[in-house]
Amino acid sequence: MSLSNKLAITDVDLKDKRVLIRVDFNVPLDADKKITNNQRIVGALPTIKYAIENGAKAVVLMSHLGRPDGKANPKYSLKPVATELEKLLSKSVIFAENCVGKETEEIVNKATGGQIILLENLRFHAEEEGSSKDAEGKKVKADKEKVEEFRKGLTALGDVYINDAFGTAHRAHSSMVGVDLPQKASGFLVKKELEYFAKALESPQRPFLAILGGAKVSDKIQLIDNLLPKVNSLIITGAMAFTFKKTLENVKIGNSLFDEAGSKIVGDIVEKAKKNNVKIVLPVDYVTADKFAADAKTGYATDADGIPDGYMGLDVGEKSVELYKKTIAEAKTILWNGPPGVFELEPFANATKKTLDAAVAAAQSGSIVIIGGGDTATVAAKYGAEAKLSHVSTGGGASLELLEGKVLPGVDALSSK
């Protein structure tokens, strides 16, 4: 699956067309159904505005919200989003009470002049995800013919299909892969994701560095495996570094996290790195704690002393940070997935902050710096660095699967240029 040859919204003629856009409006709502964070709605605005400005007859928006498990549930209605959209766009938004069906088709077909129509939650139909849950919470597969019918119902609402929901791209749901229109293109959010991941995975400027954190080696094995033939250097940090240190160098790690299953593959990873000429950088000192809490008694340990029993490493120390900074400064492409420490707790946030500072400095001196979603995206947001980096991915699971070398159904379904 090539990421760089997919059709984008800018390649498609939208004049007088019904433009069907899969957006990600899965926003948090409070008990009064008020939106507590509208970031995802704001993120979709450039694509929506582009369709209107380029003469679309109707702009039809479809999304999921929460997990209603294939049944209509007012708690998960997208109606509050219609109100928010009207505010943000200063334009009227028609809310369709169902995402498919005769009435919805009539609303869409009557629309003119770039009218925006927001469809009700796709997941009110079991046919969107392909399954629902029964009263006991057991999964029930959706009827194949009904899934086909649902997909035809969505297809009937557009002339052109645009996918701007990268966070769901790893799911083969009906709205992601089942719309059968001649032109299926990416919106601006998905376009940017694909462009930047192509810059890392398909044609990186070298040296190419990957920074990988996280808890378990066994969780990241596919990621490491896919990146080793591509990168020049690899920083392994976060809790999973302890499994490497103990297995390779017999460093005492105290009560730090040790991944028994992961320890069995550490040797293979190191061999593969040697074969591919990849420099592996591991931490050499640690900030320790007697418990996993902000008020823990803290200490400091080096490789030579080891971490004493009763203590665990929750961050890496200054010497490690210096190593990371040097490696980051040498790289031209940097892909970061996973923080070095437990940044949510202030005493263990130092290395994460300093690694982020180094990444920002690299981006400002012309390197491409990509944050691969998840916890590291939270770090960038927490310290206000999003705009200072080349790209912060919006897809947690989708980014990870892409980095693992998996085909994303939602991307694969797009037309090629």
Curated annotation (Swiss-Prot):
ATP binds at A215, K220, A239, G313, E344, D375, T376. ADP binds at G214, G238, F343. CDP binds at G214, D219, G238, G338, F343. This is Phosphoglycerate kinase. Pathway: Carbohydrate degradation; glycolysis; pyruvate from D-glyceraldehyde 3-phosphate: step 2/5. It catalyses: (2R)-3-phosphoglycerate + ATP = (2R)-3-phospho-glyceroyl phosphate + ADP. It is an enzyme of class 2 (transferase). GO terms for cellular component: cytosol; mitochondrion. Mg(2+) binds at A215, D219, D375. InterPro entries: Phosphoglycerate_kinase, Phosphoglycerate_kinase_CS, Phosphoglycerate_kinase_N, Phosphoglycerate_kinase_sf. The keyword Magnesium applies. Pfam families: PGK (PF00162). It is found in: Cytoplasm; Mitochondrion. (2R)-3-phosphoglycerate binds at V23, D24, F25, N26, Q39, R40, S63, H64, G66, R67, L122, R123, H170, R171. The lineage of its organism: Eukaryota, Fungi, Dikarya, Ascomycota, Pezizomycotina. Its main location: cytoplasm. It comes from the Eukaryota. GO terms for molecular function: ADP binding; ATP binding; metal ion binding; phosphoglycerate kinase activity. Monomer. AMP binds at A215, K216, K220, A239, G313, E344.
